[in-house]
Swiss-Prot record:
It catalyses: Hydrolysis of terminal non-reducing N-acetyl-D-glucosamine residues in N-acetyl-alpha-D-glucosaminides. Involved in the remodeling of the N-acetyl-glucosamine residues of proteoglycan complexes during reproductive development. Is essential to promote the first divisions of the zygote. Belongs to the glycosyl hydrolase 89 family. It comes from the Eukaryota. SUPFAM superfamilies: (Trans)glycosidases (SSF51445). The keyword Signal applies. It comes from Arabidopsis thaliana (Mouse-ear cress). One of its GO terms (molecular function) is alpha-N-acetylglucosaminidase activity. This is Alpha-N-acetylglucosaminidase. InterPro entries: Glycoside_hydrolase_SF (IPR017853), Hex-like_dom2 (IPR029018), NAGLU (IPR007781), NAGLU_C (IPR024732), NAGLU_N (IPR024240), NAGLU_tim-barrel (IPR024733). Keywords: Glycoprotein, Glycosidase, Hydrolase, Signal. Its EC number is 3.2.1.50. Gene3D superfamilies: Chitobiase/beta-hexosaminidase domain 2-like, Glycosidases, N-acetyl-b-d-glucoasminidase.
Amino acid sequence: MHSIKLVLLVLLIISFHSQTVSKHHPTIDGLLDRLDSLLPTSSVQESAAKGLLQRLLPTHSQSFELRIISKDACGGTSCFVIENYDGPGRIGPEILIKGTTGVEIASGLHWYLKYKCNAHVSWDKTGGIQVASVPQPGHLPRIDSKRIFIRRPVPWNYYQNVVTSSYSYVWWGWERWEREIDWMALQGINLPLAFTGQEAIWQKVFKRFNISKEDLDDYFGGPAFLAWARMGNLHAWGGPLSKNWLDDQLLLQKQILSRMLKFGMTPVLPSFSGNVPSALRKIYPEANITRLDNWNTVDGDSRWCCTYLLNPSDPLFIEIGEAFIKQQTEEYGEITNIYNCDTFNENTPPTSEPEYISSLGAAVYKAMSKGNKNAVWLMQGWLFSSDSKFWKPPQLKALLHSVPFGKMIVLDLYAEVKPIWNKSAQFYGTPYIWCMLHNFGGNIEMYGALDSISSGPVDARVSKNSTMVGVGMCMEGIEQNPVVYELTSEMAFRDEKVDVQKWLKSYARRRYMKENHQIEAAWEILYHTVYNCTDGIADHNTDFIVKLPDWDPSSSVQDDLKQKDSYMISTGPYETKRRVLFQDKTADLPKAHLWYSTKEVIQALKLFLEAGDDLSRSLTYRYDMVDLTRQVLSKLANQVYTEAVTAFVKKDIGSLGQLSEKFLELIKDMDVLLASDDNCLLGTWLESAKKLAKNGDERKQYEWNARTQVTMWYDSNDVNQSKLHDYANKFWSGLLEDYYLPRARLYFNEMLKSLRDKKIFKVEKWRREWIMMSHKWQQSSSEVYPVKAKGDALAISRHLLSKYFP
């Protein structure tokens, strides 16, 4: 295992700036020492770990002795140690867990519960916690060897994406946040993003620059769209923010930070990226402020389009950036040195001149360092992938080398699919964190690349001249695919690749509380299918039920059915394949993402259901069973849609009628299926939004935000739907029945009418109707959707399997 000292030596050798260490060019060692100095006392961290144990296993609160140890006891880095407790008497602690921070203690506890007690921890919405397998106090499994010693091969385990706060956390109160921070500690996360409540800080800062509340009403986005307002993609959409919201979120942030710190985590706070209210132009007419281009509005509506960016080279940028950092310190205390800033994310500099780019980067960092002399810039590396035509090696080097060595850390955001580290000479000497992106928009889709997750961090760390300093998870939305996140978290403690096949057997046994051969066989299939995506395609869920294609079937005619430019689809329940042919043209038939054999996954579902009588009491089993049934049926619906469009092109009105009814029936059946699990309900999302409201106006606004984000997302007009519609689609009961079903019905009715009347399909008419339907649904507040499941999930899944795959 490579030690941190070796990594640091390599960092020094390849440093662009200097081959010697000085107080002006600190190494990662120096940064870690300074961050350690900000941590609370050992007793505080031990108390936090004991509190977690009490919440997780209240019956075993006296069964474990938890202690903080120094890094020297771990060879100079972070670690946890699990030993048998050999105290006097037979009553009291049985297991001793030691760690360098509260996070390491929690990680050690989790490791022991997983690998000695077959326990399992996942998000509540993915089945929750399974600790029934833990033996009673006095009978805990002993450690066979002298001890279990696990040392971090890299110092950091990073967590969150800048948009997770909107897709997943937006409606959370402290009770839910407490469970999340516990989950984070158990997974070993020690470098989490902490973006909640920053609008209250900005209000105080901008007040010093004569920006009024009314100006900020046009600047802040609504609760469900704050992430994109913060990035300068939009303004005012879904707003304004009430005083209640600002005050409550700031209070919540202080609770979040307090708990993170007690565990020994280092929170990453926001910094100034240059995004400013439009009113600043009038107050500072000489300032170098640029209006940005349209970001995804349908017609450039100035009410929310085209935000303003203060150029980093302007002295006002430094002044505002310094004020923001200092205001956070005043509110929260000296709790971190690491700040996130993504000035250039989806915001290409006006020139590719390396000197200019270097000057911009230096200015961004100067604003941070004026506010905190020890500031370190944490930057998402998404721009190097999404805008690779601009960010060539000269531009990349110019930005990465614009700050002192050791003062920037890059997130290799999409490393499990499109790593940058191996194409950029390890970010030209800049420390980076290997990250898994995995999820977009909080979509619900069984998907992953487990082999890449097992091997990627290890390959990066042991590669020549490695500058890797962490493993991270940067999903846009959480509470899906728990297997992916458990493995990724574990890789922060693994110095070698994991045998995924063996690991999954252990995972299944832990997750369902017992060994079951059908389940093991099912997971073997899932490992090689849904969790083995290697096509390099970003998995935005494009299943046609939740993202009905805005496609004009009249654009394809019978003559287009040629073998040229064709593709394969798997048709219906017949578990065979036939060729459906469409010529590649501008209005080509939409294709949902499919990277595996549907036949094999149907077999995995059969195995899952065979195990149902043995595992039906397990909430984790029920969640996975419902999710797998949904996955199978959604892919079948994609095939049915394709066959329906083919029937339309062939003017086969009889087949079109039958296939369209089958598609609609699938939506209804899937709604019933999803209604049988508490974790798949629209009502939970809507009610959590309304629960935060303090009055009727807020209640209406928050519900509109919640409804809009998961459907139309952004602005539209009478004839043009939002460019981001269905980006955050969800397979939730209630949403299928009341939104996706009527939309699909409108679409197929227009197709049938077109054939009956022998007229061209009027795509504009259908668009107008479904946009009107969507607006009405978004603005509605009369329906109250269930927050509790109904129906027997196992019986429903078995019925649907026999119905569609007899």
